[in-house]
Amino acid sequence: MFAGIFLRMGAALRSMYVNSKYEEVREEWEEDYSPQRFSYKALYKATKGFKESELFGTEANGTVYKGKLSSNAQIAVKRVSLDAEQDTKHLVSQIVGIGKLRHKNLVQLLGYCRRKGELLLVYDYMPYGNLDDFLFNEERPNLSWSQRFHIIKGVASALLYLHEQIVLHRDVKAANVLLDEDLNGRLDYGLARFGTNRNPMLGSVGYVAPELIITGMPTTKADVYSFGALLLEFACGRMFIEYPGKPEEFNLISWVCQCWKRGNLVGARDARLEGDYVCKEIEMVLKLGLLCAQYNPEDRPSMSQVVNYLEGNDVLPEMPPDTPGISIPTPYHEVLA
C-alpha cells in the first residue's frame, strides 16, 4: 500500500518537474498568434537542451542556437532577455507581422516562444553565419568579387521589398546579413528591429545616419545611409569606422574619397581581391556607397534607384569626389566622446 503511494508521489513530482522545465508564458491575447507559436519543449529538444555544442553565435542581447525540429527542418533559435518595462503585446505583434513578410533574400522569421523574462525567436538556419565574419575575419575564406556582388544585389533587393511594404529595417549592417547554403545574402532583422535593444539611438554605431543621431526618427533614407556604409565595406573589406587609424582612414568615406582624388578610386578595394574583380563594378559600388552615405538625406537615392544601379538598368549620375555632401564623414568621434 505504502509502496503504491510513494510511487504515485514520485510520478507526480516527476510530472511537476517536467512541467516546470518546459514552462511557458501564454496569455489570452496570444490565441490569435497560435500558428506562429512554438512550444518551448519542441525548441528545447531541437537544440538538445540548448547545449553548448549547439551554440551558433552570440549577440549583444542574446545567444543563437542551431536546432533540428522533429520534422527534420533546421532552425536557428535566438534567446533574448526581456525586462518588465517592455510592451510584450506590441513586441509579439511585431514579430508575427514580420513573420508574414516573404522574400528570397530575407531570413525567414518562423515564429516565437515566450517564457518568464525571455523571448525565443525561431528562424531559418543559415549555415555560413553572418557576413562580417567573412569581411573582417582573416581566418575565414575570402569571398570573391563575384560572390560579394551577388550578395549585395540580393540584400539591396530585400531592403527595397521592405520599403515597398512600408517596413523600416533600422539596423542594416554586415552582422545582419546572413549567408545560406548557396552563399546567397539574406537580410536579417537583428534584435533592434523588435525593440529588444534598449539603446535609444536605433541602429549600430558606424551605420547610423547623422540625422538619426539628432532626431531619433528612423526613415527609409536612414536605411539607405546604412546600406551605403555596407557597400563601402563590401568593396574595401574594412569596417566603416576603424579605431585606431590614420586620420584619412578613420572613416571609409574619407579613405575612398582620398583614393578617388588621387585618381585611383579602385585602389580603395580590398587587397585580398588581388586581380579577381571587375573594375567597372568596383568603381560603381564605391561611388554608389558614397552616394547613399551622403550627409543630406534628401540627396540620397531611394532603394528602387539603388537596385536599378546595381542591376545595370540605370547609370550613376556624374559627380566628382569633392561634390558637396559626398566627402563629409559622419562625426562619430564627437558623438562618442
Curated annotation (Swiss-Prot):
Phosphotyrosine modification, residue list: 123
Entry keyword set: ATP-binding, Kinase, Nucleotide-binding, Phosphoprotein, Serine/threonine-protein kinase, Transferase
Binding site for ATP: 56-64, 78
Disulfide bridge positions per record: none
Keyword Cell inner membrane: no
Gene Ontology annotations of biological process type: response to other organism
EC number of the protein: 2.7.11.1
Domain Protein kinase: 50-316
A UniProt-annotated Pfam family: PK_Tyr_Ser-Thr
Reaction(s) this enzyme catalyzes, per UniProt: L-seryl-[protein] + ATP = O-phospho-L-seryl-[protein] + ADP + H(+); L-threonyl-[protein] + ATP = O-phospho-L-threonyl-[protein] + ADP + H(+)
Active-site positions on this chain: 171 (proton acceptor)
Family indicated by similarity: Belongs to the protein kinase superfamily. Ser/Thr protein kinase family.
Name assigned to this protein: Receptor like protein kinase S.3
Organism: Arabidopsis thaliana (Mouse-ear cress)
